[in-house]
């Protein structure tokens, strides 16, 4: 008996500097471990509750996702736009997903998805800084790690050469260090059954 979720490793990063505060607790490995114990103790120890994507980062999921362009017009992950099945293109979640995908896609494709180039909007400076800079609290949205954002920005800048939209140009001027690749990332703190691990490698 399996209850399978799709929460990734990135959901474990806390949101408030210096404190273990995570509004995504229900998506974290900590919750997964706690709930598995509860199920075993009080419900049915034959039930396996786990997140299949837990070993992967959200960056790796995005890298895989962009190989399926047929889903670009229909996928959606914006809380504000959920009722209308659109991207509001004005919140931290939209900006985060835009940055993540900008590592792999050109701006023309991204504008078709989001309706505008979010990296060319000066008004998103504060949201941008919260997603990428140490010492800045992350937005209370379901967004990935700052390491993923930095890697995505590094790749996005390389893809675009000298033609950088405002927020990329602003970030490039800080001369950020070259981030570590996540191609081979694998979080071993997971509950994926051994016979399914091969699906993720």
Q: Predicted regions: what is each one?
A:
Residues 1-201:
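Nucleotide-activated chemistry modules centered on ATP-dependent adenylation/adenylyltransferase
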